[in-house]
From Swiss-Prot:
ATP binds at residues 181, 183-185. This is Chromosomal replication initiator protein DnaA. Residues 1-90 are annotated as: Domain I, interacts with DnaA modulators. Keywords: ATP-binding, Cytoplasm, DNA replication, DNA-binding, Lipid-binding, Nucleotide-binding. It comes from Vibrio atlanticus (strain LGP32) (Vibrio splendidus (strain Mel32)). One of its GO terms (cellular component) is plasma membrane. It holds the Pfam family Bac_DnaA_C. The gene is dnaA. Domain I is involved in oligomerization and binding regulators, domain II is flexibile and of varying length in different bacteria, domain III forms the AAA+ region, while domain IV binds dsDNA. The keyword Nucleotide-binding applies. Its main location: cytoplasm. Belongs to the DnaA family. GO terms for molecular function: ATP binding; ATP hydrolysis activity; DNA replication origin binding; lipid binding. Oligomerizes as a right-handed, spiral filament on DNA at oriC.
Amino acid sequence: MSSSLWLQCLQQLQEELPATEFSMWVRPLQAELNGNTLTLFAPNRFVLDWVRDKYLNSINRLLQEYCGNDIPHLHFEIGNKRVTAPKSETIAPARTRTAADVAAESSAPAQLQARKPVHNIWRDEEPVAVDLNHRSNVNPKHKFNNFVEGKSNQLGLAAARQVSDNPGTAYNPLFLYGGTGLGKTHLLHAVGNAIVDNKPNAKVVYMHSERFVQDMVKALQNNAIEEFKRYYRSVDALLIDDIQFFANKERSQEEFFHTFNALLEGNQQIILTSDRYPKEINGVEDRLKSRFGWGLTVAIEPPELETRVAILMKKAEDHQIHLADEVAFFIAKRLRSNVRELEGALNRVIANANFTGRPITIDFVREALRDLLALQEKLVTIDNIQKTVAEYYKIKVADLLSKRRSRSVARPRQLAMALAKELTNHSLPEIGDAFGGRDHTTVLHACRKIAQLREESHDIKEDYSNLIRTLSS
């Protein structure tokens, strides 16, 4: 059995899994073959449990395929593989180079490609004195235990947890992107709180990108730019929200570029959020956009129905209000764009119930949210979905209704059907009828196909999220 066994498995898994999943869960694994036992080393318990739960069957299948009857026994451990392994074959660390790796290496400064060990708080055994006057700005209310997990934010939450457990080493930088009100800021604060809980001496700073700009301007005005540099380069974790506001601010970008490099070289954690994918941020230098993608980039999508219901139930519980399941589903089916909108609607319902003393029923919600529901129903129609999808893909609405089966038409048609199922209250037969008299089974197939492609294709996932944002805004 050759030492390339695990590398063969890696190469196949990289083809089968979405790039984000592969980078987050599989690539960090190290492997060692000793006799008839293949040991996979995970960096922490969270990764180990996730891999065993999600990918064990795939790994065993590949081992069976490559080894036949000589399939090795699979064993998992936490930590790094042993430095020496006498009388055994040692498989290289699980680091499969991709095109993204090559691009990052070609643009990364030499000192960051071969990062030197740096004395920092994550490895200090003794307490370190920290300036207690530093501005943390981390909101203690936003923690992991009150963040509602769903399919739309599962990867982002998992990445944030890993970073909080292994700051400066797990994924650096971590870049979270998605529309307004989807929970990116909550995750930033949750990471900050978790880091401080684990390491009370850690100097964690959260801020909006505009605050960084304001601080730099004040430093220039007061001839205190060196103090500014020292402050930002001394933090153990820098959490910056809405990085897209750096657009067209050349001096701020220049200073952040050097701050970014200094923090990364010092193994200090950086987490950034934006409303769009790094390469789509206009007005930001290419060298910065390249660096944004050096660690891990994760999309936070609009919450699906089940997550929206869970969010409403959790918020109602926080207010010590009983919310019937059917009421939660009624609200969740009609308000789909983001978490903030859901919370605002629920707050209005609760306030009205407190003022009037009436029970929260579907009829009461329909009355309390009359204007909001009317606006949503007016905005999202099948006709509107068809026009928006056709415009997005630069085809005609008539193409969506036609019998054409070319990929350039069939895929947008399937997306439009899936969006109609997600964003309207029409039945499958009604949706099929609106798309050229198609059968309800065709609509069902389209919905399932798009759900599958959103897991496998970054482009389809992005298109779907963009269309949801456009139609819900």
